[in-house]
Amino acid sequence: MFNHHKVEIEWGGRPLILETGKIARQADGAVLATYGETVVLATVVSAKEPKPGIDFFPLTVNYQEKTFAAGKIPGGYFKREGRPSEKETLVSRLIDRPIRPLFVEGYKNDTQVIITVLQHDLENDPDILSMVAASAALTLSGVPFMGPVGAARVGYVGGEYILNPHLDEMAETKLDLVVAGTSDAVLMVESEAHELPEDVMLGAVMFGHRNFQPVIDAIIKLAEVAAKEPREFLPEDLSALEAEMLKVVEADLRDAYKITNKQARYDAVNAAKAKVKEAFLPEGAEAYKWTPEQVATVFKALQAKIVRWNILDTGSRIDGRDLRSVRPIVAEVGVLPRTHGSAVFTRGETQALVVATLGTGEDEQYVDSLTGTVKETFMLHYNFPPYSVGETGRMGSPGRREIGHGKLAWRAVHPLLPAPEQFPYTIRVVSEITESNGSSSMATVCGTSLALMDAGVPLAKPVAGIAMGLIKEDDRFAVLSDILGDEDHLGDMDFKVAGTAEGVTSLQMDIKITGITEEIMKVALEQAKDGRLHILGEMANALSESRGELGEFAPRIEVMHIPTDKIRDVIGTGGKVIREIVEKTGAKINIEDDGTVKIASSNGKEIEAARKWIHSIVAEPEVGEIYEGTVVKTADFGAFVNFFGPRDGLVHISQLAPERVQKTTDVVKEGDKVFVKLMGFDERGKVRLSMKVVDQETGKEIVQEKKEEKQEAEG
């Protein structure tokens, strides 16, 4: 019944198993992949005919985590998986990026890749396994895919690279780098690092590339026995159309790409496009020699060629810069004075308005995942409204691109943030892209660094980011610093590098062609470092280090520690005590399981009142100390006084006043505020208090009484 095939290798100290022919047999390609005890299913389905009326490749990648994979039931009313989580979105992008450039150019059949996590051993992250499984499923499917692709995660501990570190090892590593590619080329890199030098980052990329070669060999071995017949697909030969179109618009496009202003350049390009449409798709014609899709495809290819020729032949770019120059930069801080921290970072025609907000433990984000619930104290949200590129468009929840760009900036800044013990605030940063012409994610990095420092967050060092590009033809290549949007679309490689003056904190690389050597990547990284240092210098003109104190409108947080066995006393039955403290002092209070108490308010008096209240609950009163209390009950033999948090004590009638007292209520009534001295404890541990040794006006001890006590003791 089943035509089952299986390949198994040892990889990174664990077995990697690829199977096909038993599950999801109606898909074009399906692979069940196991690494350790983590299991994923990858499937590929591609339409038999191209999607009409489009000039792009309609590829969709969906990565999904099923909660049953970790033995859990989803939360919420419906108890089933809902919209994709942030991680699912990010892993979908991670899988998409290395496979997309490997489809044969011109293939436009609707294609969907679905990867489902079926089992998680809580040691091996499913993301790398999912990339491998997707590559294997595509290789078996028969679609025109020039793979297979391998992938690996690289850690860095004690000066040594680690292949596919376990989840518990990730806490120790100074690097979390994912690399993917073919047998002879790196295609994609995604990473977070703790200020590592460029040579260590490049070494990690090459280490990963070498170590995923056995995976590629295993996929090929499986394909040799299980792959479907390749689909017949011949890319269209549009060279004749290209030659004709060059005659019509080459001069117009060359002139258009000499215009430095983005909108004016787009107007000129659109005029050239209209000229092409008139020449090849005239209105009223009964039939066309070329289809609208073919004309659009060739026009787009011509744009790329003309830009690339200009750069390689003249060393001059679209906006007139040379290869290494960074666009003019203006950095400003404190632009929204009532917010906790703000900055506007402008680089050429790209601009980010970034605002930092400080919150308390109540504002932490709880993220449910297969490995458990994680508390996030740093959030970075990137928004790309359509007006930033002079267009109308959809508004609403963030798309995959916005989530991905936000996470890239998050990775760049995260290693420089203070530990929660040093800075017990929840931080949310929002980056609004108000203008865009390339490199908006790196503008977000720069703006975030400035906004955090403006808010008084003790960032270890300023962070900057730069987007780089590469154009390669045969043996000639050009590395471009601070690329424009057009250079991003028309180039062969774009990579984004963020970090401090000392090292790299984030590296993202996407390579669209083969033949990018280690030497070319080294040149590109060194050029990116020069650009990053220049940007840091420009940022320093606005703010070079964190302000010494928090903004006027930011909350203040004081941290205190209480014994864990006292947590119950502070919270009270059903939360009664802590609610009363919050209501009466106005401060926000967060208590953690280890006894850490965070008290927050924009008013210092509220914090102090809450701190004293909590201290009075958990501390023990000291013999000989004077306390202010409230009479809570009177009796024939004395008065009970609440003097230390919830603790009451008896002032015997003989201790109410220096003179003889006939009746307790002659001296005090319920509700009176009094000063008492803790004299000690009786044999049953009951508190003994005295009022007569304390001046009830000043709260000071009566010295004469002390002398008499001393004389009595000596006598």
UniProtKB/Swiss-Prot annotation:
Residues 624-692 form the S1 motif domain. The keyword Cell membrane does not apply. Its main location: cytoplasm. It catalyses: RNA(n+1) + phosphate = RNA(n) + a ribonucleoside 5'-diphosphate. InterPro entries: ExoRNase_PH_dom1, ExoRNase_PH_dom2, ExoRNase_PH_dom2_sf, KH_dom, KH_dom_type_1, KH_dom_type_1_sf, NA-bd_OB-fold, PNPase. Its EC number is 2.7.7.8. Mg(2+) binds at residues 488, 494. GO terms for cellular component: cytosol. Its cofactor is Mg(2+). It comes from the Bacteria. It is found in: Cytoplasm. Belongs to the polyribonucleotide nucleotidyltransferase family. Involved in mRNA degradation. Catalyzes the phosphorolysis of single-stranded polyribonucleotides processively in the 3'- to 5'-direction. This is Polyribonucleotide nucleotidyltransferase. It comes from Chelativorans sp. (strain BNC1).
